[in-house]
Amino acid sequence: MNRYFALCACAILGVATGSIGAQSPAAAQSAQSATAPAPPVGDQNRQYLFAPTGEQMPYRIYVPTSWDGESALPIVLFLHGAGANERTYLDQADGLVRMLAEQHGYIVVSPLGFRPLGAYGNPLRLPAVFGESAAAAAQRAAVTPARRRELALSELEVMTVLELVTERYGADRARTFLAGHSMGSGGAWHLAARYPERWRAVAPMSGPFVDAATYPFERIRDLPIFMTEGTGAEPSLSGSRALAEFMRNGDFRFEYLEVDGNHGSMVPMVWPRVFEFFDAVSADQPRNRP
């Protein structure tokens, strides 16, 4: 198993969840597939055994049908929003994400996140958008031990799926991208700061769940970020505009785009631009990845 991932798993669960085991299924998956034929391509609904809880966890992936079975493809970890699941966004707009993944040559991984409202480790939700520090503080104070455990498991679960698929398909660790919508956008901001060395770039969509008082901005200073929002997506719109101003004034590697859509309809509007952004970042000299 990748040493970097093992350390991440131990850090998450050892600190936040006490006695829960931190063993990843990625190593077992890798060993089992050592003599297996090339893994399948196309659209796939899959599941795996999540060792910390002993549960089968679903995830969905799309692998370009043009893959030759050997090339190290770039990979996108996408985090769904509240009320959705691992399947939802890959079906939107007649499968737009799948079409773009095929066209641009990316693997797309969409995990559940342990529970539908697991939130990938980020405890913030509406109205705690950027600039609403009082709401953020109140939400953090209200997190119970059970919820803290669920948040930690959600974070670990998506990182486990990413590692599993990366190993199985030999994906390019130097071109690993992170994106998410709404609750998933909050997860993207959270994971960007937790593992800044893991990502080539990040694309949060309509979910500025970032606490100005506590977020470790210096950890993402060198990370390219493309944030998108819909002009009809209040109350997240005001938070996104405030966060965009903060990022620009701070000279971060940051781009911001607003489209004429609401909180949900903006997603298919921005996906083509997100893949174009990832392509542009990929064309730069990549950083080393663990």
Question: Predicted segment positions?
Answer:
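Positively charged n-region of N-terminal signal peptides that target proteins for export
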Residues: 1-4
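Bacterial N-terminal signal peptides
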Residues: 6-19
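A domain-start/cap signature at the N-terminus of enzymes
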Residues: 22-75, 107, 146, 154, ...
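Serine-hydrolase catalytic machinery in alpha/beta-hydrolase-like enzymes
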Residues: 45-58, 70-170
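Soluble non-cytosolic domains of exported or imported proteins
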Residues: 73, 91, 148-156, 193, ...
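Alpha/beta-hydrolase fold active-site loops
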Residues: 74, 106, 200, 223-224
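Primarily recognizes the serine-hydrolase "nucleophile elbow" in alpha/beta-hydrolase
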Residues: 166-168, 173-222
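The feature captures the conserved acid-bearing segment of alpha/beta-hydrolase catalytic domains
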Residues: 201-275
